[in-house]
From Swiss-Prot:
Record keywords: Ribonucleoprotein, Ribosomal protein, RNA-binding, rRNA-binding
Gene Ontology cellular-component annotations: cytosolic small ribosomal subunit
Transmembrane segments: none
Task performed by this protein: One of the primary rRNA binding proteins, it binds directly to 16S rRNA where it helps nucleate assembly of the platform of the 30S subunit by binding and bridging several RNA helices of the 16S rRNA.
Identification of the protein by name: Small ribosomal subunit protein uS15
Disulfide-bonded cysteines: none
HAMAP family for this protein: Ribosomal_uS15_B (MF_01343_B)
Subunit structure: Part of the 30S ribosomal subunit. Forms a bridge to the 50S subunit in the 70S ribosome, contacting the 23S rRNA.
Lineage, highest ranks first: Bacteria, Pseudomonadati, Campylobacterota, Epsilonproteobacteria, Campylobacterales
Single GO MF annotation: structural constituent of ribosome
The organism's place on the tree of life at top rank: Bacteria
Translocase as UniProt keyword: no
Similarity remark: Belongs to the universal ribosomal protein uS15 family.
Native source species: Helicobacter acinonychis (strain Sheeba)
Length: 90
């Protein structure tokens, strides 16, 4: 269920702004997005798993806060990121 190392490295490589960039907002949002997708699939198969549902809500809130920060600081970066991830603009 968790992201394996290879998948994580692919995401980091795709969204990094420079080499060895693992902590930029874009990378963090992309990793959170992938974890959210995995948890959503898990919850479809296990609808009574309430602890995972709470974890999913926390991840969504964390992603929302990071996206809000990016939108506030650099709107062009925000637009590119949500297009790459396929997230709707609120």
């Amino acid at each position: 269920m968790a992201l394996n190392l290879e998948k994580k490295q692919e995401i980091i490589k795709a969204f990094a702004t420079k080499e060895n960039d693992t902590g930029s907002c874009e990378v963090q949002v992309a990793l959170l997005n992938e974890r959210i997708k995995l948890l959503t699939e898990h919850l479809k198969a296990n609808p009574k798993d309430h602890s995972s549902r709470l974890g999913l809500l926390e991840l969504v809130a964390q992603r929302r806060n990071l996206l809000k920060y990016i939108k506030r600081t650099d709107h062009a970066r925000y637009v590119v990121l949500i297009e790459k991830l396929g997230i709707k603009d609120r």
